[in-house]
Structure formats: C-alpha cells, structure tokens
Amino acid sequence: MPPYTIVYFPVRGRCEAMRLLLADQGQSWKEEVVTGDSWVKGSLKSTCLYGQLPKFEDGDLILYQSNAILRHLGRSLGLYGKDQKEAALVDMANDGVEDLRCKYVTLIYTKYEEGKDDYVKALPGHLKPFETLLSQNQGGKAFIVGDQISFADYNLLDLLLIHQVLAPGCLDNFPLLSAYVARLSARPKIKAFLSSPDHVNRPINGNGKQ
C-alpha cells in the first residue's frame, strides 16, 4: 500500500506541486477523489481541521494546508536545501510562489472575465522576482536555490505551467524562467508525469476556467 494518500477534488489545484514532487522522487501515492457534491453533502468537510482540502496522509500522520504538506515532504525526502541558509531561501521562494498563487486563485474564482486583462498586464512584475532568484544562483542554470532540487522548485514549476496556460507567452521575456521550465519538465520522471493521462485529463481548476 502506498505510504502517502492525497485526498482532494478532481483537479490539479493545490495538489499538483506535491504530485510533481512525489513522481519525480519515485514515490507512490494513493488518490482519494472527492466530488463537489460529496464535499457539500457528505461528512468529510466537518472532519477536516480547517474545513478544507487537501488532506494528506503519511502513515498515521494527517496534514492539512498544502504548503505544510510540501514542507513536510521537503524535510522527509531531503528537498529543503543543504543547510539552514538554503532552507531559509527555499522558504522565501516558496512564500513568493504562494503569494502569486493566491492572486491566481482569486482571479480564477472571483473575477476571471473582468479581471484577466489587468492580471496578465501585471504578471511580468510578479514573475520578475523569480527570474531574479534564478539569476542569483549559478547564472540561472540550476534550481531556485542551491544545486539540488527543493520542494519550492516543484511548486514554482506548477505555478509557471498554469500561467503558461492562462497567458501563453508570459515567459517570453524571462529567458531564465523559460529555460527553467524546459529543464525541469525534461527530468525523466516529471516528463512522464506531465504526459500521463492522470495529469493531462485532470482540470487545472474546479470551475473550468484556466
């Protein structure tokens, strides 16, 4: 039986980064898919700590909050930098990913039609810090921090991939980010995951907007 279980809606949402991480690290996991109807009418929501998903099970450890789950996997699988300095930088980068993801989620679920144009216009300013971080680490030819992949890389990769769907060409003026996406997407296990039916057929968001 797989050691990990992801309990989540039938979308990529806040779980695709952890799926990328697990796939790339050669880990197996079980998916428990929760439909919107069962979430609203069933009892699961009342048992969830914050009344929300994802719920993540690692043996008898149950976690909520997607970034707490990523950090747990980072610690467990050696994906948290090589020392405390790198760990702090990984946290900083991941917090930046969360900031932009929150903006994205707000757009998708609350003001897509009227807000998309302004969002796309402002997007370069939100992407620039990640280009800067890459430029400060081995000329942008490695990872977001240090010389080994971290949980923040998987989170950033997912964020960039969904923005390329929202705004094709959004990375055209960011050569380091463009190369970074290509480089990480070419890692054999990530490449296999990204081309798998599970990923391809899984909607990005729950309302059909992307």
Swiss-Prot record:
It is found in: Cytoplasm; Mitochondrion; Nucleus. Residues 83-204 form the GST C-terminal domain. It catalyses: RX + glutathione = an S-substituted glutathione + a halide anion + H(+); prostaglandin J2 + glutathione = prostaglandin J2-S-(R)-glutathione; prostaglandin J2 + glutathione = prostaglandin J2-S-(S)-glutathione; prostaglandin A2 + glutathione = prostaglandin A2-S-(S)-glutathione. The keyword Ion transport does not apply. One of its GO terms (molecular function) is glutathione transferase activity. GO terms for cellular component: cytosol; mitochondrion; nucleus. The modification N6-acetyllysine is found at K128. Residues 2-81 form the GST N-terminal domain. Keywords: Acetylation, Cytoplasm, Lipid metabolism, Mitochondrion, Nucleus, Phosphoprotein, Transferase. The modification Phosphotyrosine is found at Y4. The keyword DNA damage does not apply. The modification N6-succinyllysine is found at K103, K116. Glutathione binds at Y8, R14, W39, K45, Q52, L53, Q65, S66. Pfam families: GST_C_3, GST_N. One of its GO terms (biological process) is hepoxilin biosynthetic process. Conjugation of reduced glutathione to a wide number of exogenous and endogenous hydrophobic electrophiles. Involved in the formation of glutathione conjugates of both prostaglandin A2 (PGA2) and prostaglandin J2 (PGJ2). Participates in the formation of novel hepoxilin regioisomers. Negatively regulates CDK5 activity via p25/p35 translocation to prevent neurodegeneration. Homodimer. Interacts with CDK5. This is Glutathione S-transferase P. It comes from Mesocricetus auratus.
